[in-house]
Amino acid sequence: MKTRLVNSLAALALLFGFCAPALAQQVPDAIINNDGIGFSRMADGQLIAYDLVAAYDEHMIVEADCSAYKSRLQGVDWCFASAANQSSFEAATQDNGRNKYLPFVGGHCALGMSVGNLTARGDPRTAVRIGNLLVLNGRFEVRTSFLQDTERNIDNARLRYELAIAAGNLKVNE
């Protein structure tokens, strides 16, 4: 009996020893991206990128042209619909890497993040500018729920996002 217990514990230790590196690799990115492209989504196996400058400045969801207009910031490529929008994005980038156009809480679903869901992805089509924040949610119905208590949801999402990064539960994109 004692031998079987020791063998079982050894097997569990071995199993967790092999799983630990795999679990460590499962930490979600701080900035949501698809194949390295931020403010994008997958549809029918195709990557669709959107112009976050158009979403922020013009309140319009516009598809971007990654082959013509692309900038890299915080380990992610950002695509634009025009050279003017790319220039606006680049001009807004500060020395510390901050940029007003970057999606709030890294493009995660803001309502999901406000309740601690670190894996809920924001859909760029739901983007809405609230003050100086470009806020995404997973679906339009979720955005509606988020907007019912915007201030509290923004505060909770910001806090949980910052705590998740500090605790290593979200990894900073490189």
Language model segments and positions:
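Charged, low-complexity intrinsically disordered segments
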Residues: 25-174
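Sec/Tat signal peptide C-region and signal peptidase I cleavage site
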Residues: 19-24
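Bacterial N-terminal signal peptides that target proteins for export
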Residues: 1-9
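Bacterial N-terminal signal peptides
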Residues: 9-17
